[in-house]
Design a protein with these regions (language model features):
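N-terminal beta1-alpha1 cap of cysteine-dependent amidohydrolase-like domains
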Residues: 22-152, 163-170, 174-214, 220, ...
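Generic extreme N-terminus detector
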Residues: 16-17, 53
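Single conserved hydrophobic/aromatic residue that forms the stacking wall/gate
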Residues: 1-16
């Protein structure tokens, strides 16, 4: 039993040894090509971890709201991404489902991190803690770390990512570390306040350049012991760690 196939012009003829078969039109190869101008590169979706607050007295008094700072949204937009605010309650409900539609996550600033996550009891100098927010962030953060998803931390976000990787923090810089620098500036937050030294060979140095840079400063906690695969990329003149990244490129 044999099958033969022949192509004549734009027609293909298929026959078997018994004489059965069919003839049909064949589209030219060019018909299957996609025009270059029709291809669109999808913008990366960046999930921004949300926080909550209760409204002031009034019509909606005590109503709990989820929020994401507009600065984070604008920064993602200005750098070619699509920002997606992630409610805290959703982080615990389905972290993998949320991350399935994200290309990276941004962990923002916020209140002090619960020291239980790095094996300590709260010291007298610790400020506001939001246990429900920390629980939600860690649910999403652990899933993102397991998936190898890129993560960018800002302020509390840096401290969170370090603890996520097994590191710990100074609960209060001024009582646990020698320092001559005011890290919690009284100036409006957009003003530059002190200097940091960005280390050669780091990803941060590739972006901003190694050496001395002026920054603002709004924190009283800081990374103490770097976590697994964590690289210190910038320090203040008093040795306080101001920026970190991971050696595997996941924490940027």
């Amino acid at each position: 039993y044999e099958i033969s196939c022949s192509l004549v012009g734009s027609e293909m003829c298929i026959r078997d040894s018994a004489g059965s078969g069919f003839t049909g039109k064949v589209k030219p190869f060019s018909a299957y090509l996609v025009k270059k101008e029709s291809l669109q590169v999808r913008k990366p979706i960046i999930g921004i971890l949300g926080n909550t607050y209760k409204t002031q007295p009034g019509l909606f008094s005590s109503a709990e709201r989820m929020y994401v700072n507009s600065d984070y949204i604008e920064s993602v937009l200005n750098n070619g991404g699509i920002p997606m605010a992630i409610p805290a309650v959703a982080m615990k409900a389905d972290p993998e489902g949320i991350l399935a539609v994200c290309d990276g996550i941004l962990v923002p600033g916020g209140e002090d991190l619960n020291p239980w996550y790095y094996g300590e009891e709260p010291k007298p100098q610790i400020q506001t803690i939001r246990p429900e927010i920390d629980e939600a962030w860690f649910a999403l953060g652990r899933a993102a770390k397991e998936m190898g998803m890129p993560m960018l931390g800002i302020c509390k976000g840096i401290q969170f990512l370090n603890v996520l990787c097994g590191g710990d923090l100074y609960q209060d810089i001024y009582t646990q570390k020698e320092t001559t620098i005011l890290h919690l500036q009284s100036l409006e937050r957009s003003y530059l306040h002190h200097h940091v030294e960005i280390k050669e060979g780091t990803h941060l140095a590739e972006i901003l350049g190694a050496g001395t840079h002026a920054v603002n400063s709004m924190h009283h906690q800081a990374v103490r012991t770097p976590g697994e695969d964590i690289v210190v990329s910038a320090t203040a003149p008093d040795g306080t760690i101001e920026a970190i990244e991971s050696s595997n490129g996941q924490i940027v």
